């Protein structure tokens, strides 16, 4: 039986190699600009802590500041793709 709370070291962690290169480059230069990525399925690894990664949500890039609690989660979990505008108002209740 598989543990649902497995960390990134226990299961195969996926991250886009080009994203990892951008992260390493930002760490070397000390650059604080957000790193743009379309790779929502990339897992957050300890190297990313303290960086801001702009994750694409289908429309725009959502800035996500990486903290240590996020390690092992996917980038896409922190950039919602759907906007909820509420249910349609009931016409009978509106006339009262």
UniProtKB/Swiss-Prot annotation:
For this protein, the record's InterPro entries field holds: Ribosomal_uS19, Ribosomal_uS19_bac-type, Ribosomal_uS19_CS, Ribosomal_uS19_SF
Q: One GO BP annotation here?
A: ribosomal small subunit assembly
Return the SUPFAM superfamilies for the record. Answer: Ribosomal protein S19
Which Pfam family, an example, fits this chain?
A: Ribosomal_S19
Tell me which domain of life the UniProt entry assigns to the organism this sequence originates from: Bacteria
Sorted alphabetically, the Gene Ontology cellular component annotations on this record are: cytoplasm; small ribosomal subunit
* UniProt keywords, alphabetically: Ribonucleoprotein, Ribosomal protein, RNA-binding, rRNA-binding
The record's function comment reads: Protein S19 forms a complex with S13 that binds strongly to the 16S ribosomal RNA.
What HAMAP family has UniProt attached to this entry?
A: Ribosomal_uS19 (MF_00531)
Output the NCBIfam families linked to this UniProt entry: rpsS_bact (TIGR01050)
Q: What is this protein called?
A: Small ribosomal subunit protein uS19
């Amino acid at each position: 039986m598989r543990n649902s709370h497995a960390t990134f070291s226990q299961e195969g962690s996926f991250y886009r190699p080009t994203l990892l290169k951008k992260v390493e480059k930002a760490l070397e230069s000390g650059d604080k600009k957000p790193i743009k990525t379309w790779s929502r399925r990339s897992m957050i690894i300890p190297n990313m802590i303290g960086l801001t990664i702009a994750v694409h949500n289908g429309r725009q890039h959502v800035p996500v500041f990486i903290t240590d609690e996020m390690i092992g989660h996917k980038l896409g979990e922190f950039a919602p793709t759907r906007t909820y505008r509420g249910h349609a108002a009931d016409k009978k209740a509106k006339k009262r």
